Amino acid sequence: MNKWQELTIEVNREVEEAASNILIESGSQGVTIDDSADYLENADRFGELYPEVEQVETVKITAYYPESADIEDITKQVNDRLDELTDFGLETGDINLVTQELVEEDWAENWKKYYEPARITHDLTIVPSWTDYEASVGEKIIKLDPGMAFGTGTHPTTKMSLFALEQVLRGGETVIDVGTGSGVLSIASSLLGAKEIYAYDLDDVAVRVAQENIDMNPGMENIHVATGDLLKGVTQEADVIVANILADILIHLTEDAYRLVKDEGYLIMSGIISEKWDMVREWAEKAGFLLETHMVQGEWNACVFKKTDDISGVIGG
């Protein structure tokens, strides 16, 4: 049995994914997320009665560190990086950080009880890597290790990205995944029939984690992962470019995306809070794209833009 140190932060729901990434990048071995919205969404799934739960606007994210980690220094670094999120227009709310030691707690195994297989779209189900799961006819399985980094793939921004990929992929496409994180969108693209997938992330941790997740899923030799800063220096053309990152970063890839997307190809963007949606749409349309689909889940937005001269199938066309 090992000793672990626990750091719990409470922040506004809109920064859940960014805050989780900050904790992972600070050396956490994994995170768990306590969100009342998830409880309420799933509470009546089996027709059972549950205690009343009030949905609040904050989430609690708990990160776990080895006993040897300098938790005081980590706490300071995490707090500083959370403060920086306001530079991207994100409101963290009143940040609350609490630390404690878990005595003789083998968290490396115990935390797994929080994660179960989740059907995300009509075809795609995300399954924790340690779980035996028998797929139904037509069901496509994505094996992930949520303890590595970047959550479980069930965040609204990821869900909408997966829905969009199902919408546009028909088989044989080349896909570029910008800011790949866990690699979930690349794995999904392969399962949905893409021929070649190129996944980029600026963070070396993400590149490693993505590759490890990809290796867990058979038949993913068509996914190529590399360190990259958005689309800078990329010359490979693509039928689809997908990016699930912050809105203030998305706007800086729209011109390069238009250069790389083939005629009649698509740009999928997610991770956009509602107040930033108009800005992202303006930048994409300025680059030359036409809006085909706009999705909203809570305060999050996702979109599918098309590189086309045919306005009949686009919004406003």
UniProtKB/Swiss-Prot annotation:
GO cellular component, one term: cytoplasm
Subcellular location per the Swiss-Prot or TrEMBL entry: Cytoplasm
EC numbers on record: 2.1.1.-
CDD domains cross-referenced by the UniProt entry: AdoMet_MTases
Principal subcellular localization: cytoplasm
Keywords noted in UniProt: Cytoplasm, Methyltransferase, S-adenosyl-L-methionine, Transferase
An example Gene Ontology biological process: methylation
EC category: transferase
GO molecular function per UniProt: protein-lysine N-methyltransferase activity
Reaction equation(s) it catalyzes: L-lysyl-[protein] + 3 S-adenosyl-L-methionine = N(6),N(6),N(6)-trimethyl-L-lysyl-[protein] + 3 S-adenosyl-L-homocysteine + 3 H(+)
InterPro entries hit by this protein: Ribosomal_L11_MeTrfase_PrmA, Ribosomal_PrmA_MeTrfase, SAM-dependent_MTases_sf
Keyword flag Transferase: yes
Binding site for S-adenosyl-L-methionine: T158, G179, D201, N244
Highest rank taxon of the organism: Bacteria
UniProt record similarity statement: Belongs to the methyltransferase superfamily. PrmA family.
General function of this protein: Methylates ribosomal protein L11.
HAMAP family in the record: Methyltr_PrmA
Entry protein name: Ribosomal protein L11 methyltransferase
The encoding gene: prmA
